[in-house]
């Protein structure tokens, strides 16, 4: 990557980020990509991105289903991850390690995340902000649904201030 653009700096981290360490890394980033497989991590990353107004490119895959979205609170109408999946809601935690995931699906979702991140960094095209892109890996069909901001959201709504 440095050969293509010497101004790009990629810093790989081989550690679990929590608390202050997570906050510091999110604050220093231009774009955050979340590829985690559990809600508590996704919510922690979302809170840090919301706090520091950093765009979050979220991707997930389980069994034969995948999803990608961008949560960019620099845009006033953009929802955050918590607007879509409220923390503390009785959402069934289904982990890849237990349920499995169709291996090519992770590559497809990851590629879509990379494309969204590059568009955000380059400032080109239309991001997935405000939309959730869903992939049915068995039918090999993509569909997009509109996402709305939750006015009662405890992370990005008026109650969060």
Language model: regions and residue ranges:
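Adenine nucleotide-associated cytosolic modules
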Residues: 1-161
């Amino acid at each position: 990557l440095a050969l293509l653009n010497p101004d790009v700096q990629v810093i790989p981290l081989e550690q679990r980020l929590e608390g202050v360490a997570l906050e510091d890394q999110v604050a220093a980033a231009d774009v955050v990509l979340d590829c985690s497989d559990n809600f508590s991590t996704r919510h922690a990353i979302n809170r840090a991105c919301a706090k520091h107004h950093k765009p979050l490119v979220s991707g997930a895959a389980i069994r034969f289903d995948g999803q990608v979205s961008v949560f960019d609170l620099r845009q006033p109408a953009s929802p955050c991850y918590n607007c879509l999946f409220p923390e503390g809601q009785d959402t069934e935690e289904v982990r890849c390690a237990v349920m499995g995931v169709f291996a090519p699906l992770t590559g497809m979702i990851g590629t879509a995340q990379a494309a969204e991140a590059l568009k955000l960094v380059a400032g080109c095209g239309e991001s997935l902000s405000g939309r959730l892109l869903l992939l049915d890996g068995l039918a090999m069909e993509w569909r997009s649904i509109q996402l709305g901001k939750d006015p009662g959201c405890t992370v990005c709504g008026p109650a969060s201030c």
